[in-house]
Amino acid sequence: MNPFRAAILLSSFIILHSSFAAEPPKVTVSNLRRVFHNGEHNAFTDLCRFRGQLYLTFRSCPDGHMVHPTSSVIILRSSDEGANWKQVHRFSVKERDTRDPHFLVFNDRLFVYTGTWWSGATTLPRADYDLNKHLGYAVFSDDGKKWSEPAMLEGTFGHYIWRAAAFGGKAYLCGRRKPGFEIGPKGEGSKVQSLMLESDDGLIWRKRAYFNETNGDETAFLFEPDGRLLAIGRHGGGKEAFLIRSKPPYTEWDRRQLDRPIGGPLVVKWGDHVIVGGRKTTKGKGSKTSLYWLVGDQLQEFAEFPSGGDNSYPGFIELSPTRALVSYYSSHETDEAGNPITAIYMAELTLKQ
């Protein structure tokens, strides 16, 4: 056989073997617990580590899931690896619904980003939702104790911002918008575009690239050390989620559909393995929050958490090479009167040796 051809075949075998044959580790789930409930609707979680402390954020609203000016973002901190949590900040934006908060550690500063629907002085009727009035905001802290006032994110008007990531001295956001900011109904669904937004300081943003020109929705980014990008995107049409890959300079994108929908997607690396999380729909049990190993282009489920109804949007933080925490929200429990509550939950993951 030609030596050059043999080298190509060997290289292809190694790539395929590493992508598809490596078995992910076994995981045990323990210490499942409710960590926050204040009588309000609590949802959309994220976790991070900053200056030796753990941080948990989520939206809280006395009026429920939909678009209300009464919503706010809560930030909790733990100094004991998640055993106990203390509120360190809570913020809102006048006449806007703050939701989907996400962390980013960037330039030695902790940011919390939120996409905000314009609501006005009262609850906004669903028929009046307008993606073109969306605007991103952030609060930030240099020490996790003292926080800025909410800062409007330049370049995000008309964009529904979502998860953030950083690589190579730049910050990146998923932003979705209507093509040409067209005037019309709400703007969610098959026509919506997903963009990679880029920033030098975490506050002023510009378009870097489109990665979904149709069916754009919530998308999570994961950068490899060499700049390669892996992303998991919710399908704006409610169908199977997207597995998206690119590499610098992010001008070409490989997009393929997974075998299931994923609501509120998460993608993180734990050691040498990639975890995907979010909401799934089951037959007979409704929606559930689950975690998967990504093996090649396939998902292998390893955990389904106690959850139901309005739920998902997990966060993840590694505690050690064999231990991690997962946060999520759910409405599967009830209060003393038998009414459903929507609360924040946490679980510990341990890799089996």
Predicted regions and their residues:
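Short, basic, low-complexity termini and linkers enriched in Ser/Thr/Gly/Pro
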Residues: 2, 8-20
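Hydrophobic, well-ordered secondary-structure elements that form the walls
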Residues: 316
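Beta-rich carbohydrate-recognition and catalytic domains
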Residues: 22-40, 49-96, 104-309, 319-353
